Protein backbone atom coordinates (compact mmCIF):
# COMPACT_ATOMS: atom_id res chain seq x y z
CA UNK A 1 0.00 0.00 0.00
CA UNK A 2 2.83 2.38 0.82
CA UNK A 3 4.39 1.87 -2.62
CA UNK A 4 1.09 2.70 -4.32
CA UNK A 5 0.65 5.81 -2.19
CA UNK A 6 4.20 6.93 -2.94
CA UNK A 7 3.67 6.35 -6.66
CA UNK A 8 0.43 8.36 -6.70
CA UNK A 9 2.08 11.15 -4.71
CA UNK A 10 4.96 11.31 -7.17
CA UNK A 11 2.61 11.34 -10.16
CA UNK A 12 0.51 14.16 -8.70
CA UNK A 13 3.66 16.11 -7.86
CA UNK A 14 4.89 15.71 -11.42
CA UNK A 15 1.55 16.89 -12.79
CA UNK A 16 1.58 20.12 -10.78
CA UNK A 17 5.25 20.93 -11.41
CA UNK A 18 6.25 23.40 -14.07
CA UNK A 19 6.99 21.77 -17.43
CA UNK A 20 10.62 22.87 -17.23
CA UNK A 21 11.03 21.01 -13.95
CA UNK A 22 9.24 17.82 -14.92
CA UNK A 23 9.93 17.90 -18.64
CA UNK A 24 12.87 15.51 -18.62
CA UNK A 25 10.95 12.85 -16.74
CA UNK A 26 7.90 13.14 -19.00
CA UNK A 27 10.12 13.11 -22.09
CA UNK A 28 11.76 9.93 -20.84
CA UNK A 29 8.37 8.31 -20.15
CA UNK A 30 7.10 9.35 -23.59
CA UNK A 31 10.19 8.12 -25.46
CA UNK A 32 10.25 4.83 -23.55
CA UNK A 33 6.57 4.20 -24.25
CA UNK A 34 7.12 4.98 -27.93
CA UNK A 35 10.07 2.57 -28.11
CA UNK A 36 8.06 -0.16 -26.40
CA UNK A 37 5.02 0.39 -28.66
CA UNK A 38 7.21 0.06 -31.76
CA UNK A 39 9.21 -2.95 -30.50
CA UNK A 40 9.02 -6.32 -32.24
CA UNK A 41 7.28 -8.26 -29.42
CA UNK A 42 4.53 -5.64 -29.21
CA UNK A 43 4.10 -5.63 -32.99
CA UNK A 44 3.74 -9.42 -32.90
CA UNK A 45 1.15 -9.14 -30.12
CA UNK A 46 -0.81 -6.51 -32.07
CA UNK A 47 -0.79 -8.69 -35.19
CA UNK A 48 -1.87 -11.74 -33.20
CA UNK A 49 -4.74 -9.80 -31.63
CA UNK A 50 -5.80 -8.43 -35.02
CA UNK A 51 -5.76 -11.89 -36.59
CA UNK A 52 -7.78 -13.30 -33.70
CA UNK A 53 -10.35 -10.52 -34.12
CA UNK A 54 -10.52 -11.15 -37.87
CA UNK A 55 -11.06 -14.86 -37.28
CA UNK A 56 -13.80 -14.16 -34.73
CA UNK A 57 -15.61 -11.75 -37.06
CA UNK A 58 -15.21 -14.15 -39.98
CA UNK A 59 -16.70 -16.92 -37.86
CA UNK A 60 -19.65 -14.74 -36.84
CA UNK A 61 -20.52 -13.60 -40.36
CA UNK A 62 -19.56 -16.83 -42.15
CA UNK A 63 -16.79 -15.36 -44.27
CA UNK A 64 -13.07 -15.87 -44.67
CA UNK A 65 -10.65 -13.93 -42.46
CA UNK A 66 -9.40 -12.00 -45.50
CA UNK A 67 -12.97 -10.87 -46.27
CA UNK A 68 -13.40 -9.85 -42.63
CA UNK A 69 -10.19 -7.82 -42.91
CA UNK A 70 -11.63 -5.88 -45.85
CA UNK A 71 -14.69 -4.71 -43.90
CA UNK A 72 -15.01 -1.06 -42.84
CA UNK A 73 -13.82 -0.46 -39.29
CA UNK A 74 -17.26 0.51 -37.95
CA UNK A 75 -18.89 -2.68 -39.23
CA UNK A 76 -15.99 -4.73 -37.89
CA UNK A 77 -16.35 -3.25 -34.39
CA UNK A 78 -20.15 -3.60 -34.45
CA UNK A 79 -19.83 -7.31 -35.17
CA UNK A 80 -17.25 -7.74 -32.39
CA UNK A 81 -19.64 -6.21 -29.85
CA UNK A 82 -22.78 -8.10 -30.91
From Swiss-Prot:
Q: Which residues are annotated as pro-peptide in the record? A: 67-82
Q: Does the keyword Transport apply?
A: yes
User: So what family is this one in?
Assistant: Belongs to the non-disulfide-bridged peptide (NDBP) superfamily. Long chain multifunctional peptide (group 2) family.
What is known about the tissue distribution of this protein?
Expressed by the venom gland.
Q: Which residues constitute the signal peptide according to the record?
A: 1-22
Compartments where found: Secreted; Target cell membrane
Question: Where is it predominantly found?
Answer: secreted
Claim: Secreted is one of the keywords in the record? yes
Role of this protein: At high concentrations, acts as a pore former in cellular membranes and causes the leakage of the cells. At submicromolar concentrations, degranulates granulocytes and has a weak hemolytic activity against human erythrocytes. Also strongly inhibits the production of superoxide anions. Has a strong antibacterial activity against Gram-negative bacteria but is less active against Gram-positive bacteria. Also has antifungal activity.
Q: What is this protein called?
A: Opistoporin-1
Question: Its GO CC terms?
Answer: extracellular region; membrane; other organism cell membrane
Keywords per UniProt: Antibiotic, Antimicrobial, Cytolysis, Fungicide, Hemolysis, Ion transport, Membrane, Secreted, Signal, Target cell membrane, Target membrane, Transmembrane, Transport
| Classification via InterPro entries | Antimicrobial_7
Q: GO terms for biological process? A: defense response to bacterium; defense response to fungus; hemolysis in another organism; monoatomic ion transport
Gene source species: Opistophthalmus carinatus
Amino acid sequence: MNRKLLFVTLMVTMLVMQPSEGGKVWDWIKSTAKKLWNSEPVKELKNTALNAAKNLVAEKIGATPSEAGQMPFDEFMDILYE
